[in-house]
Amino acid sequence: MKFTRYPKRDAIRDYFPLPNEIFSLGLSTGEIALYAYLMYCEDRKTFQCHPSYKTIGNAVGMSKNTVKKYVDSLIEKQLITAEPTSVYTQKGKKRNGNLLYTVRPIAEALEQYYEQQLIRLHEENRRQ
């Protein structure tokens, strides 16, 4: 029996990309975990996914309220967008569905982060 240290895996199916720049944005561990899970779930062609707060919470070990807090934070930092969806029941009633998350290009988030850093620097210089 031949020993193989690492089993062969399909790079596209078994792995997901996480940009290196994500660690330069000053994100908390919860934000990084949530962002990584959304990257894991996303469709690689549309950059969209639609897990529920409960599904995300179970995957990363957070409560639904904590997931909502971090989703709002990632939206504010322009890393993701979230759009409400709706579903129809068998009886024809319209209900709220899961949010549709779109993972935005990391360059936009970096640009906003650097702009905020410059604004803070200018404010600190004015105070001195």
State what each model feature region is.
Residues 1-66, 72, 94:
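Short recognition helix of helix-turn-helix/winged-helix DNA-binding domains
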Residues 44, 126-128:
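Proteins with a high burden of low-complexity, intrinsically disordered sequence enriched in S/T/G/P/A and R
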Residues 64-126:
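Winged-helix/helix-turn-helix nucleic-acid-interaction surface
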